[in-house]
Amino acid sequence: MASIRPPRGMRGNRPSRARTRNIDGPRYDTPVMNESPHGSTSHGTRTRRSNRCLAIVLAALLASGLATCFGAAPAGAAVYPVSEPDPFYAAPPEIGAYQPGDVVRSRTVPASGYPGATAWQLLFRSANSAGDPIAAMTTVLIPGGGGARPLVSYQPFVNSLGLGCAPSHGLFDGGLREAEALNLLLARGWAVAVPDHLGPTSAYGAAKLGGRITLDGIRAARRFGLADGPVGLAGYSGGGMATGFAAALAPEYAPELPIVGAAMGGVPVNIGKLALDVGGSPNPLFGLGFAAAVGLEREYPDVMSLDGRMNPAGEELRGRIANACTDEIIGAAANRSFTDYFVGGMNDVSEAQIRILHENSLETYPGVPRVPVYQWAGGNDVVNPWLARDVAGRYCAAGTPVQFDIIPGADHGAAIAPGSVNAFAYLGDRFAGLPAPSNC
């Protein structure tokens, strides 16, 4: 198979693979893809290894900067968000009696900001990372007109720990920065499902959870009345992580769904390697990294506990941002690093922690999408586009058509707009039944 190959001018600055066996995970012999860059740029962030913690860490959206230490300390009490005050979100005691994707309750809400659309919110049954039943939420926007229509599940980037920051709120209170993109989808006549993919504890960083919630949200929307059309997936950055995991999980977790394509951009595909790249020194977005550590602790409290590893400043910060949204999180720890908040030596992480890291990183998660994939990244993205290219190469080797594009000169924030235009056109072609392009 032909390889997805970087342009000649980009090869010299490719960061070397992290040498830590645990972080790297399994090695895949993958082809290198023939990228479709519209020009050459260089990515020059070199891996820092001198400050490798005894921990797994994650950087997420809008440049990413997670640097924190998970150690072998005894499990303590994770700090969870204040409960959602709206009783509509509450899981019924019998949630385990429902099947994944079953609608528990529904309601209409005003579709302010989405002209001509109607909006429904669906509480449905899903499963957390341990497989336990949970209640999750998706908001479904339906454009005017009748008949069968495609459904796009759009996963927003949500860099938050508070339940009030979830898409089901941000869609209508101005907090969701991707509302304009949703109107572009509605203008095409497509229904749009927007899941609260961080789950009922706002477990920021738990990407596999986001994939499950996304798929069960699609099931819920179809069982609610949108079962006649094809399905597409889309998302960027943290939303791209949930999108990528939904595509990779679907063949086993939800094989019955008629998903015809997935489009994802700016995706952090290996949370450990990204941490080694950006976590060893002060970073303006370090707060997002700290928040992701808190989110992983919420989803895996017995293994990813932060108790005993934080100094008093870390304990205070964890409590202060427990209900915060993106801007507050960024401001709370701007230009800090893990040494400001954590204590401990340079020991290796445990096998259980490595397992959790791998199951939340697309590079090391073995599942492969069975539908065509469009993937894009900015040429100057701090979220290393080379790792995403490697994942695309593995998908190519497994027979999945992948179109991988580099947006020349774009950093993480700038790549979303042009890539989304291409992504929506790509999904439109999949809905029309056209052959999927591929630069495998």
Model-derived regions, located:
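Histidine-bearing beta->alpha loop at or near hydrolase active sites
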Residues: 381, 403-415
